Amino acid sequence: MAEPDVSDTNTALKKSGEPGMELENNKATSGAVVTEAGFNTRKLWPDLIKLPSNRWVYSCKEIVDRLGTDPKAAQLTKKKMEKCLMYFYMIKKNLRLFDHTYTAACILFFRYWYIYELPQSLQDCIHLSQAILATACKAMENNRPLDMYVKATCEFMMKDLAQQQRGRQNMDKLKWDVRDKLVRYEKQLLCQFGFDLDLQNPKELIEEIFSGFYRFNRDNIMDEEFKKLFPKILAEARNFIIQAGTQPVSLLCDGYTFTALALLFAGLQYKRSTAPNFRFPRHFFQERFPIRITGPMIVNLFTDYRILEDNFFDLKSNKGDKLEVTNEEVQSLIDEEPTDETVPNPYDYELIKDGVCSQEFLDHTESKLKELTEKIISESLKKRPVIDDNTPKDDTKRVKM
């Protein structure tokens, strides 16, 4: 089993320690700081560091086989995994984190489990999960102060202790231990992942692909009837992504395929329950995703998802028979042009760098900014009521009784 590629990073660090050596394509510039001993900061920390990129996609059989052949060991592993996923969910609620931060933590968690397996003790699994969540928060720009992670983690761990053990537990000592473990595990995680935090988070992708910019500049030509019902499909797709994150589905495909799978599942449920003639507009996926969508590919992914549900966690959010999909159903849902050519990336910088947008989008953005400004002002006034300067102040001191 191949571990994440960290060769480029390790090579750069090794070269930096050799006297007289310079990193390839990163020679010291005239602005570099050189000490009297000859140490050059640009050798160890160049202006541009090339980070390795890994393809975190595996077959369904490889994922299931990772549980091992021993039923007792597999059951113990799944028990630890369930506890870690519950930790993500509870801390997400307590710290009021974004949904895409929760999905990012789940993605990192399953990647770590597949490559390195989980620690032996359940307590160490919680420490690992805390570091994964903190890393996900930073990657998604949804970070919290260190003490908030520590406090929430300690409260989560205390709930598992018996009443007698809680009384004997030194809370201050536990907090320091949790704090130290967070720092240590976070450093360890970054090294083990090879600093590869390119998550392709489907929850983040679906918000970007259907953001206000594209809604007003690309999707404004869609059929009016489809535009009215599409928000329902989009909401169902968001729920699918969050719920599917609790199973190792993120190991089956890349983020764009995961996002397309969520939209197809939502469209399929709408077609089955409400509108038998429903179909996505022509070239809907070709114009929005840098991947080629085919019927057999989608059917295989739904089948693999069902197999993962049967082998991993029995949850209320499991889709069960809803994942039983035929190629005919998928073909009746999409209208894509079959081609063997590579699908261009619609989000290539060269294609969107001109920044041309419609006036309707500019007006929409301006109205949103005004609403946000008014909201901030009203909230600040509630916290700090306006005081009239002409009101006489009561300077009399209270007498202590």
UniProtKB/Swiss-Prot annotation:
GO terms for cellular component: cyclin/CDK positive transcription elongation factor complex; nucleus. GO terms for biological process: DNA-templated transcription termination; positive regulation of DNA-templated transcription, elongation; positive regulation of transcription by RNA polymerase II; sno(s)RNA transcription; transcription elongation by RNA polymerase II. Residues 1-25 are annotated as: Disordered. The keyword Aminoacyl-tRNA synthetase does not apply. The keyword Nucleus applies. InterPro entries: Cyclin-like_sf. SUPFAM superfamilies: Cyclin-like. Keywords: Cell cycle, Nucleus, Transcription, Transcription regulation. It comes from the Eukaryota. One of its GO terms (molecular function) is cyclin-dependent protein serine/threonine kinase activator activity. It is found in: Nucleus. Belongs to the BUR kinase complex. Component of the BUR kinase complex involved in transcription regulation. This complex phosphorylates the UBC2/RAD6 ubiquitin-conjugating enzyme (E2), leading to monoubiquitination of histone H2B and the silencing of telomeric-associated genes. Also required for histone H3 methylation. Necessary for the recovery from pheromone-induced growth arrest in the cell cycle G1 phase. The kinase activity of the complex requires the presence of BUR2. Overexpression of BUR2 interferes with mitotic chromosome segregation. This is Protein BUR2. It comes from Eremothecium gossypii (strain ATCC 10895 / CBS 109.51 / FGSC 9923 / NRRL Y-1056) (Yeast).
